[in-house]
């Protein structure tokens, strides 16, 4: 799977975005030899399993200029770095408690010249700030995740959709989401035809500001 996969689903990519996504693969392959943040199997399918998967969030919600997005448990930078490439006028804060993963985030961001990415090597519960949307990729079950990010949603809505969580998940979520009646599930197979996305979803959960 190559860069053509991204062009297929995002035909409006600018030359600068295409250049960054191209360089992204080189940077991750290089850094993954030093610090294993992506499995050996997945690194060969980086565009499909990590980059395009991250961009599934964009199919559900794009971010307006000036918005602030928090990526919780970012690992080596997913979904935050691909989202930051797509939204150069939005601010992305990427947090992870594991220092070596944040090292990769910093090096990749610097290598791409991404000025809209800030990293934090700490637990999300210790992070101060309010965000329009909080994104992540299956780092915990929803009740735990909601507890982690409580109090981090911005008061004002700058998008048509209310501020909240955009969570990349997979499988049967009926039990996990039974207490969240306002949650909405978007099937990524509705947007991407590859088999990998058959069970993949974006869960949107609106959240209220708690001052």
Curated annotation (Swiss-Prot):
Residues that bind S-adenosyl-L-methionine: 73, 78, 124-125, 137
Enzyme class: transferase
Disulfide bonds: none
Keyword Nuclease found: no
Record InterPro entries: rRNA_ssu_MeTfrase_G, SAM-dependent_MTases_sf
EC identifiers of the protein: 2.1.1.-
Keywords, alphabetical: Cytoplasm, Methyltransferase, rRNA processing, S-adenosyl-L-methionine, Transferase
Subcellular location: Cytoplasm
One protein family per Pfam: GidB
GO MF assignments: rRNA (guanine-N7-)-methyltransferase activity
Protein family membership: Belongs to the methyltransferase superfamily. RNA methyltransferase RsmG family.
Annotated function: Specifically methylates the N7 position of a guanine in 16S rRNA.
HAMAP family per UniProt: 16SrRNA_methyltr_G
Protein name per the record: Ribosomal RNA small subunit methyltransferase G
Gene name in the database record: rsmG
